[in-house]
Amino acid sequence: LKIGEFAPTFTSVKLRACIFLSLVVTFFAMNAEETGSRAIVGGGCFWCVEAVYQTVPGILRVTSGYAGGNVANPTYEQVCTGRTGHAEVVQIEFDPAKISYRQVIDLFWQAHDPTTPNRQGADVGPQYRSIILYENEAEKTAAESSKLEAQAHFKDPIVTEIVPLKTFYPAEKYHQDFYNKNPSYPYSEAVIRPKLEKFEKAVREKGPS
């Protein structure tokens, strides 16, 4: 080597490799936090919210379940007592290239009435409360911002809880894809179908976000 040239050593090469790896890991961690690939919300009976989000482009899968409570692996019967702390919620898996977490949350305000505490129509109890469960600070910020903007469209205060997710518990199999499997069920005809029609009308009138 000529005087002044740097001779790479094993230690320096290893150090640079570690720095590069750290940057790569940080980049992907930040990217995952910004975009996400699922949202968990509750707005009354999960059959209704599930059916609504199944109509949205970019949504890959919607799973009904329970979250926000203090009982592990709750059953539907337990949640219905209102004593588990859980709400009926849906896990919404989406394609971030087609729809963002914020857009998923913006649609939430059209999917239910967020101004009625512990109630959606005739469904009454804490398990039917309006709730958004976030998994990181980026989701929390997006949810709070969306809620703040949505308030301008409601006369009464929005009572939606925005809380960190602990665990999402999928509901029993017979609850999954309920409306599509049971379109003639009395609840489907009396509650879910009108809510779907109202949602689709509201989205059309609002236009693309």
Model-assigned labels for residue ranges:
Residues A17-F27:
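Bacterial N-terminal signal peptides
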Residues T9, L21-L23, A202:
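Enrichment for repetitive, rod-forming helical segments
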Residues F28-S209:
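Flexible coil/turn and secondary-structure edge motifs
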